[in-house]
Amino acid sequence: MSEVKSRKKSGTKGAPAEPGKRNEGGKSPEARGGGGRGWADPRTGVSLLSLGTCLGLAWFVFQQSEKFAKVENQYQLLKMETSEFQGLQSKISLISEKCQKSEAIIEQLKAFQIITHLKHLQEEIYEVKTWSSRISEKQDILNNNLTTVSQDVAKADQSTTSMAKDIGLKITTIKTDIRRMSGLVTDVTSLTDSVQELENKIEKVEKNTVKNIGDLLSSSIDRTAMLRKTASENSQRINSVKKILSELQGDFNKHTDRLLSLESDRAKVLKTVTFANDLKPKVYNLKKDFSRLEPLVNDLTLRIGRLVTDLQQREKEIAFLKEKISNLTTVRAEIKDMKDEIKHISDMD
């Protein structure tokens, strides 16, 4: 518009400067002025057209910028969705790894065959309980035998005091009998040593059970075999004790018969009486040792019961693990369904 105005001004200024040309053309200045206005009108039209095109272009650029902003927002949203989808994929991969690990653990548990081992262990524990009950019954029988032996010793004491005059003629036989009695005393001491060894073995077994309770499932068969061996050894020792007691009873009967025939040398008889009195505390100590054995056997049975309860708890834990694994399989199926839905949505987009 400014160019058009400047051109109009230049046209008006140039009109009086050329009078000769006016006369030559034969036209009036009014006609000339009309021609200048006609020359300026197309320029204004062109400028208006250019102005309209500029406005159209500006409007087009504005619309394009709005569309570009919308596209950029959609791109940011897509970026967020892809990051969330990647996080979901990582979580799904972690869950699938956990499922694979749990399946491997289940296969390992199946390979170990824990249930069969547990059944074998329960059967062997029942057998050990029966062995312990038999041992307790044999101990009761031994206690009764010991009471009868003590009563026989008391009767022997009374008979020795009444028959003190009959010993003078058979001192040599008494010496040999005393030697035999000393041999029996050594047998009794060896028996006490064996009982002590048995107690030490029981303590060792207890320590081993406390230390190796984690490896109980793998080494239960060997331990039950060792327990059977020790129980059989105990029964053999009890049988040997019974034999020794029967021999003692036979020797006591022989001595009572011989003491009835002895009638002299009262001092030596008193020595034999003191020897019999020395035997009494040893027999009493034997009773004490057997009474100490009873609580140990009871403690063993209690510990076996605790082992049974621990095994039942482990069975419950295994059942709980199975439930968890079934839940994991259902979760895995749901995750697969989610993956399929996400793939379907991505295909739709």
Curated annotation (Swiss-Prot):
Compositionally skewed regions (Basic residues) per UniProt: 1-11
Location in or out of the cell: Endoplasmic reticulum membrane
Basic and acidic residues composition-biased segments: 19-30
Membrane-spanning segments: 45-61
Bilayer topology: Single-pass membrane protein
GO cellular-component term (any): endoplasmic reticulum membrane
Positions of glycan attachment: N145, N327
Keyword line: Coiled coil, Endoplasmic reticulum, Glycoprotein, Membrane, Transmembrane, Transmembrane helix
InterPro entries on file: Inh_kappa-B_kinase-int
PTM description: N-glycosylated.
Region annotation Disordered: where it falls in the sequence: 1-39
Keyword Coiled coil: yes
Coiled coil: 183-216, 304-347
Further details from the record: Shares a common promoter with APAF1 from which the 2 genes are transcribed in opposite directions.
UniProt xrefs under PANTHER family: INHIBITOR OF NUCLEAR FACTOR KAPPA-B KINASE-INTERACTING PROTEIN
Function according to Swiss-Prot or TrEMBL: Target of p53/TP53 with pro-apoptotic function.
Protein's UniProt name: Inhibitor of nuclear factor kappa-B kinase-interacting protein
Species name: Bos taurus (Bovine)
Lineage: Eukaryota, Metazoa, Chordata, Craniata, Vertebrata
